[in-house]
Amino acid sequence: MKKTLFLFLIAATLSCTSQKSSVVDSNPAEYIKTITASDLKTHLYVIASDEMEGRQTGSSGQKKAGDYLISQYKANTVSFPKGATDYYQRIPASFLNAIRNDNLPDSENIWAFIEGSEKPNEIVVISAHYDHIGVINGEVYNGADDDGSGTVALLEIAQAFETAKKEGNGPKRSILFLHVTGEEHGLLGSSYYSQNPLFPLANTIADINIDMIGRHDEFHNDSSNYVYLIGSDYLSTDLYNICETANKKYVNLFLDYKYNDRADPNRFYYRSDHYNFAKNGIPSVFLFSGVHADYHKATDEVDKIEFDALEKRTQLAFTIAWELANRENRPVVDKSGN
């Protein structure tokens, strides 16, 4: 009897040890380190180069930028989404010109995808717009911060998640990396996606939107160790808490809620692509470092980007996505958003 009990205890111990070794490591610390200022700079010098001709919606320059994004996803073995035939969500000119008639040609959202290991049908969206305002009076508006910074952040976040996946620590939920077009003409790419989603909006648990995170504004001349968070608590207390906790555990930026005030006259909450998710009841957070003297000017160039700050803000977006993708429950919608 004693011998039988002894053998049972040994077997149970071995079983527990085996189970522990197969548990996914929920700590993203080692993958945070793969997001670097150096890599962000390398990507941004391409995305915000004169060759891209200011990335006007539907232009040949924007299509070159899209080609570069796709080449990087392929290099990192991040595929296009299940259910899609390639990396493009094609948007007809008829949709892009329906409201403002800016005479835009056909354009595309660019998407990439990492499938979740346990809840693949639940989707975390990470979005950034890759269009800018093109060439004006012979000057190329390269939009290094707006939104080259968010565009390259998505590439680095995808690379970090893919590295984790290859090491057996892939996300439990699926992640859609969504580079939207037409933001500068009225959030058109995200509007098209929200009306023609590849995955049901009911299965989309959150959107993390990244738009202009590469500089500092007049309110933070003494330090760039901050980021504005907008909208995290509008629909979901859970999302607000996730953002706060992820920052405290891993990044330690100053989270500034100045523009989270619904009475703020700038109305930034309504001016970037997360809004097309939020208005459909999807918890959303907008990461932003504020406006500066080069906003929508030809002087928004790569040499003015603060890459150490861009690195930390990108790392924060990654950790928020990590928490959303791996926590037990999706964030509860417990507020109206109004």
Question: What spans do the regions from the language model cover?
Answer:
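Acidic/His- and Gly-rich active-site-bordering loop/insert found
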Residues: 47, 73, 100-134
